[in-house]
Amino acid sequence: MTRKYFGTDGIRGQVGQGVITPQFFMQLGWAVGKVLAERHADGGGLVLIGKDTRISGYMFESALEAGLIAAGVDVGLLGPMPTPAIAYLTRTFQASAGIVISASHNPFRDNGIKLFNTQGVKLADDVEAAIEHQVDRPMVTAERLGKARRVPDAEGRYIEFCKGTLPWGFSLAGLTVVVDCANGATYNVAPKVFSELGAEVIAISTHPDGENINLNCGSTKLNNLQKQVLESHADIGIAFDGDGDRVQFVDERGEVVDGDQLLFIIAAHKQRHGGGCSGVVGTQMSNFGFELALEALKIPFERAKVGDRYVIEAMNNNGWKLGGESSGHIVCADVTTTGDGIIAALQVLRALNAEAQTLYELKQRMQKMPQVMVNVPVKRKLNLEENDMVQTAIAEAEQRMEGQGRVLLRPSGTEPVIRVMVEGQQHGMVSQLAHELAEVVGRATS
């Protein structure tokens, strides 16, 4: 399907540029409302709107609200909430849809939206296509206007849901946890979840001002978390991104534990203590060491395209309940419908509790293969498969690794970059090849 507005993860861009304007968001809200009204007997029902902590979120919230109301749809306003919380609340309120205003791990100058259907799952391609078709039509106000209201205790509902995914009596008592909330949507929720389960919580990056979301903090900037874990002699550090659908850990030695390692810990726990793990979906970027570690436990593994939409699709096709990405998007489909940083973190802590080991000890069960990724900024699209210079460079890199590694080049679905990933047995060679390939890609797109 050729998309005009929607990317692999909704619509995203710099505020004030392209379609990231209040005018477009009002038109988009109206289009969403019209499509829902056509597909639901009750005329569109209720749509929930939540957001992260970007200052532009207020503007876009009001614009979407106006468009939806003009289409005759009622609106429930959740305020700042993690993306997975909005998916959960959409499902439990039996709302027609849920809308998230966020640009995830991007800086505050960016914003965008994600949409969930009534099951709390990202919209199907045909629904997005219908919305794109509608959004370009003249906006006509419905005969019956919708109404808007604030949703009471949305935060409390989600906190109780998170705690309820653990066995009765589960406790984090005696554990010191540093939680980095990226000055984003988890700033109020995450510390409460862990403290209410008994952990001693040291919360950092929990003072959003509208502009400091993801600024030198959160799951993409772990330096502060590593420092705080070591200085406070904490047992563990947990970092979320701006909208709370990604998570990364830091162990008691201050070492990063990424999404592949966290997925393996969860899968191994399910295999040993949870009645088995039917299979795990990773992505093209998943570390080969992750695949080998799962193979040793006889857990099936499949690679999907990058993007939680494709991970979930592969999970559904296989009937598996666990999948995710190296970046920390982890989907535990036995308890939720989308990537959820807090839920994934709780599953890791459950595994640590069962094994009675530290995170550093537990992660040793999976040996990562050296992997280097370089992001190459691009100003124009490049067909990688048809570019002779790029393909020659890839073939030469693979030949130099003598079949003991992987090369992957792919355009990002959320940023104007091409990601160059090289994986092999020797870090020095892997790093050299990755940067050489990045130079070739840079020349090809200049």
Curated annotation (Swiss-Prot):
The active site is at 104 (phosphoserine intermediate). Activated by phosphorylation. Keywords: Isomerase, Magnesium, Metal-binding, Phosphoprotein. The keyword Secreted does not apply. Coiled coil: none annotated. Pfam families: PGM_PMM_I (PF02878), PGM_PMM_II (PF02879), PGM_PMM_III (PF02880), PGM_PMM_IV (PF00408). Its cofactor is Mg(2+). HAMAP family: GlmM_B. Catalyzes the conversion of glucosamine-6-phosphate to glucosamine-1-phosphate. Belongs to the phosphohexose mutase family. This is Phosphoglucosamine mutase. The gene is glmM.
